[in-house]
Each structure stands twice: as structure tokens, then as C-alpha cells.
């Protein structure tokens, strides 16, 4: 790319990967530099953390109005509404009585929330960001959390996802 792209989309890489064609990426600021080669050559995982920020997120939490039934029976209804209103879900977390989804804050969100409120008790938080850290460690995670208001956190062996209040 001669336009200085900072991200190579997976849809660009996937066809090359499928045909085992290596991709050479040169730095925009110095095209004569060595660059990086993306290829299938048996190299192990990179031990460098990768930080991915998704800004302008909303965390929507739904709770069943009638506690006589478990929320699991309502999952299809929730996701049908989310799909109908074209919301892009970035993260999902569920419990016995609630389900929370982190979605992009688009013009479709208010109508989706209004429809969800017809069926569920709904709370939501705006002005959030989703931070995903791939290749994390406990030390990296603690540094990432420092000074932030965490609304929701998910951690697996090597990946952490934090929904945080955006800082002005």
C-alpha cells in the first residue's frame, strides 16, 4: 500500500494464506528497510502483546423481568433483536439471570434498546472502549488496568478483554 495503511485486514491476508503466498510488508516511512514477512514457515507464536482498542462502545445488560425462567431461554430473542437492529457485538457475557453485550455505538442502538426494554429490564453504559490484549501476562494486565474504570473483564490463558470507561 502506498497510502500508509497501518492495519492489514484479515480479508487481505486470508487468500494469500490459503494459497501459501508470503506477504512482504515494508514500513511506509522507510520503504528500503527490511520490513516483515507474513508467511507459513513454522515460526512459533510471537511473545509480544498486541493491544486492540475499539472505541465508542456501549455495554447493554439485560435481565429477565420474570425470574421464574432462566435467561438462557431468551437468548434467541435477544440476538434476533440485536440482528434486526444491525448491532455489531464485540463481546458477550452471560450469567444465570443476565446477559451483557458490548456493541458499537451506532444510530441503531436507541431503537434496539427500546425494543429490548419491552421484554427485559435493560441497563446500559455509554462512552466505553473495549481493550483486547492478545499475548497478555498478569503483569501486562495489571498495567493495562491501572487508572481505568473497568465495567467488565474477561480473561483467558493469553487474551484479556476489558470494557473500560473512555477517558477524556
Give the location of each predicted region.
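C-terminal catalytic "cap/lid" subdomain
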Residues: 1-168
